[in-house]
C-alpha cells in the first residue's frame, strides 16, 4: 500500500540489559483500509495463500480487513492463526480480538499477553496453563481443535489443545550470549508455523519455534545467521 500523504512508519527499539522496549509511530501503516485488501492484485495473493497469520497490532488499524481474511480462511478450509502481540491488545481492543477468536486455529502469546487476555475475559487466575485451557475451549467456527501457545521467555512453553495441556522445555542459553530479544516472539511463531504447515506433531513445531527464537536473541536486531542450521528437531 502506498499513501502519498504519509511517510513510512517508524519503530525505535531500546535495549536495556537482556530486555527491550519499543516506541512506534505507525504513520502510513495506520492508514491501511479494507479497500486495499480487496484490490485484484492483493486479493489474488490471498486466494493463493495456504495459511494466514495476523498480528494483534493489526487490530488497532483495520479489524474489517482481518475479519475478511478470517472468513476467507474458514470458507476455504485454510488455517488462520493469530498473535496477541502486546498486553494492550486484549485490554483495549477486546472486541475485534474476540470477533476473530472463533476463526483462530492457532493462538500465540507470551505470559504477560496471556495474563492481560485472561483479565479482560474475567478469569480470576494468573496460571498460564489454566488460561490456555480456558481460551482453547472458547467457541470456534469449525470442528478443528484450537491450539493455544504461550511462551515465557526463559521458562517452558505451554501448549493447550484438545483438552490436553503440555509444557515444553526451551533451549538453554547462557545469559551472556543474549544480545537482543527483539523479534524473538515473531521468530518463535515463524519456526512453529514452518512445521505446523507440514503437519508435523506439536512437539516438533514448538522445538522449531524455540530453536529459531534462540538464534535470533544471539544477534543484533531481528536477524538470522547465514549458515544452514544444524539443529535436529
Predicted ranges, named:
Residues 140-146, 154, 172-233:
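Conserved post-catalytic alpha-helical subdomain immediately downstream of the catalytic base
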Amino acid at each position: 500500500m502506498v499513501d502519498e500523504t504519509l511517510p513510512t512508519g517508524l519503530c525505535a527499539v531500546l535495549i536495556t540489559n537482556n530486555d527491550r522496549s519499543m516506541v512506534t509511530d505507525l504513520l502510513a501503516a495506520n492508514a491501511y483500509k479494507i479497500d486495499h485488501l480487496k484490490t485484484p492484485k492483493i486479493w489474488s495473493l490471498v486466494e493463493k495463500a495456504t495459511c494466514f497469520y495476523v498480528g494483534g497490532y493489526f487490530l488497532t488499524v483495520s479489524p474489517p480487513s482481518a475479519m475478511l481474511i478470517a472468513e476467507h480462511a474458514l470458507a476455504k478450509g485454510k488455517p488462520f492463526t493469530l498473535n496477541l502481540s502486546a498486553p494492550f491488545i486484549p485490554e483495549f481492543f477486546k472486541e475485534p480480538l474476540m470477533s476473530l477468536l472463533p476463526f483462530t486455529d492457532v493462538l500465540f502469546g507470551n505470559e504477560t499477553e496471556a495474563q492481560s487476555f485472561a483479565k479482560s475475559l474475567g478469569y480470576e487466575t494468573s496460571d498460564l496453563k489454566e488460561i490456555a485451557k480456558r481460551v482453547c475451549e472458547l467457541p470456534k467456527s469449525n470442528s478443528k481443535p484450537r491450539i493455544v501457545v504461550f511462551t515465557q521467555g526463559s521458562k517452558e512453553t505451554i501448549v493447550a489443545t484438545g483438552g490436553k495441556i503440555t509444557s515444553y522445555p526451551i533451549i538453554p542459553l547462557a545469559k551472556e550470549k543474549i544480545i537482543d530479544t527483539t523479534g524473538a516472539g515473531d521468530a518463535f511463531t515463524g519456526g512453529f508455523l514452518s512445521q505446523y504447515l507440514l503437519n508435523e506433531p506439536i512437539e516438533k513445531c514448538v522445538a522449531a519455534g524455540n530453536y529459531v527464537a534462540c538464534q535470533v536473541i544471539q544477534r543484533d536486531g531481528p536477524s538470522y545467521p547465514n549458515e544452514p542450521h544444524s539443529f535436529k528437531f
